[in-house]
Curated annotation (Swiss-Prot):
Belongs to the dethiobiotin synthetase family. Pathway: Cofactor biosynthesis; biotin biosynthesis; biotin from 7,8-diaminononanoate: step 1/2. Pfam families: AAA_26. The lineage of its organism: Bacteria, Pseudomonadati, Pseudomonadota, Betaproteobacteria, Burkholderiales. SUPFAM superfamilies: P-loop containing nucleoside triphosphate hydrolases (SSF52540). It is an enzyme of class 6 (ligase). It comes from Janthinobacterium sp. (strain Marseille) (Minibacterium massiliensis). Its cofactor is Mg(2+). Its main location: cytoplasm. It catalyses: (7R,8S)-7,8-diammoniononanoate + CO2 + ATP = (4R,5S)-dethiobiotin + ADP + phosphate + 3 H(+). This is ATP-dependent dethiobiotin synthetase BioD. Keywords: ATP-binding, Biotin biosynthesis, Cytoplasm, Ligase, Magnesium, Metal-binding, Nucleotide-binding.
Length: 236
């Protein structure tokens, strides 16, 4: 088995809904009977839970992805880097005495690709978040060479953030295959005009607009999205 649908989910900033949209993607895939796996490439911010086997660290985003997928992965593959401190990844890694190696993340992805029919890889923070002194998430995306889905957090300033992110994706030789408008600020004035401005300027299709949800559940978000235009999206 080798995955035929693969994508890298990035965003215009941190805390703008990458994980919710990634879980919505996974939900849609699972609903079509696809064996779908998820990788949270780098997770910064974890809580220790005591179990019979000892102390186990959990990250909310990584757990949400695992719950939405239907291919069960070892933690080491699902989250190549699970960092304890909730801060910039390179800082969290340094505090933990860890060096984030893009080659290791790619190796995990290659293994997971053989275990599933679809793989959703979620980045960390925005598209150019430092992972080390020499690499950032853009370098990771380029190394994985996956089509990119961009989550735009709808709030003041999102036009500039979205257009700069799209330019950075193109500068890495990557293909932006779709974008999602996710409402971060429910009181944002002229939100529809902002979405229209982006739709006129981005070559990739708009996959949908997600309102501010009371509970950011995968099925609830997926109801506002249409992924059928994505490359290699499985036929119903």
């Amino acid at each position: 088995m080798t995955a035929t649908f693969n994508c890298f989910v990035t965003g215009t900033d941190t805390e703008i809904g990458k994980t919710m949209i990634s879980t919505a993607l996974l939900h849609a895939l699972v609903q079509q009977g696809v064996k779908a796996a998820a990788i949270k490439s780098v997770a910064a911010g974890a809580t220790a839970i005591q179990t019979n086997e000892g102390e186990v660290w959990h990250n909310d985003d990584a757990d949400a992805l695992a719950q939405a997928a239907n291919v069960v992965l070892p933690r080491e593959l699902a989250t190549p880097y699970l960092l304890h401190e909730a801060c910039a990844p390179h800082v969290s890694a340094e505090l933990q005495g860890v060096a984030i190696d893009i080659a290791h993340i790619k190796n995990c992805y290659v293994q997971v690709r053989e275990m599933a029919e679809a793989v959703v890889v979620e980045g960390v923070g925005g598209f150019r978040v430092p992972l080390s002194d020499h690499a950032d998430t853009a370098d990771l995306a380029r190394e994985l060479a996956l089509p990119v889905i961009m989550v735009v957090g709808l709030r003041l300033g999102c036009l500039n953030h979205a257009l700069l992110t799209a330019d950075a994706i193109a500068a890495r030789g990557l293909k932006l295959v779709g974008w999602v408008a996710n409402t971060v600020d429910a009181g944002m004035p002229f939100a529809e005009d902002n979405v229209a401005a982006l739709a006129a300027r981005l070559s990739a299709p708009l996959l949908g607009c997600v309102p501010r949800l009371a509970a950011p559940l995968p099925a609830a978000a997926a109801a506002y999205l249409d992924f059928s235009c994505l490359p290699n999206w499985p036929k119903a």
